[in-house]
Curated annotation (Swiss-Prot):
Protein's name in the database: DNA repair protein RecO
Gene name as annotated: recO
Keyword DNA damage: yes
Record keywords, A-Z: DNA damage, DNA recombination, DNA repair
GO biological process terms, semicolon-separated: DNA recombination; double-strand break repair
HAMAP family: RecO
């Protein structure tokens, strides 16, 4: 069995004396792991940095085997990631969530493209937090937990939508919320794609998407805690001037 594809490096760990096992998110084969022979060598180790865009060739005797990769660099994002605290925290959050959320060997070409585009924006701090929010919404949608923010779950109207139901993921208007308002999640305008937004508003929106990651996605994956990297990114965005 063999194939060739492009992929984003999500994680790398040492394997034996000279090899490494890498976890990747590929365009056509989904999240896929494999061994890189000589992965700790001076030639290959610098290539294997989280977020790197790689040309991957995978081979295994049987399809369900771990298999091995040969890798060639296409694009390093190390310089962009090291350009500032937001870029580094953002990269770590993206690759950690992809590793955490995605099942192995299940293709998600649309999310792959969205992830590639988001990582290519690293270092552009003025637009990155909002781009990340939109990516997180796409991640929830891909996993089957997408939010329906088009109309009120109670009235069906699309006016004055200011809350999200923590159970259904649907929007709720101010008038329909009534005495339940305190139990609902905030729906800031940026969560509905309504133009640019200040960072505090984006942080508020990320607390809402975080509820569904924590209380819907994580339980579906066996109640594992969300990656700490996401929490660190949210804390950083919350403190941006």
């Amino acid at each position: 069995m063999d194939w060739r594809d492009q992929g984003i490096l999500l994680a790398v760990r040492r394997h034996g004396e000279t090899s490494a096992i890498i976890d990747t998110f590929t365009a056509s084969h989904g999240r896929h792991a494999g061994v890189v022979r000589g992965g700790t060598s001076r030639r290959i180790a610098p290539i294997l940095q989280p977020g790197a865009q790689l040309d991957l060739s995978w081979r295994a005797r049987l399809e369900d085997h771990l298999g091995s990769f040969t890798v060639e660099p296409l694009r390093s994002r190390a310089a962009a990631a090291m350009s500032g605290r937001l870029a580094l925290a953002g990269l770590n959050a993206v690759v950690s969530l992809l590793s955490f959320c995605l099942p192995e060997r299940e293709a998600h070409p649309r999310l792959y493209k969205q992830s590639e585009q988001l990582l290519d924006l690293l270092g552009q701090d003025e637009i990155w937090p909002l781009a990340y929010l939109r990516w997180e919404l796409a991640l929830l949608d891909t996993l089957g937990f997408g939010l329906d923010l088009s109309s009120c779950a109670v009235t069906g109207n699309s006016d004055d939508l200011v809350y999200v139901s923590p159970r259904s993921g649907r929007a709720v208007s101010a008038g329909a919320a009534g005495e339940w308002a305190e139990r609902l999640l905030p729906l800031p305008p940026c969560l509905r794609g309504e133009g640019p937004a200040p960072d505090p508003e984006i942080a508020q929106a990320l607390r809402t998407t975080g509820h569904f990651l924590e209380h819907r996605v994580a339980p579906a994956l066996g109640h594992a805690p969300l990656p700490q990297a996401r929490g660190r990114l949210l804390d950083l965005i919350s403190r941006l001037p």
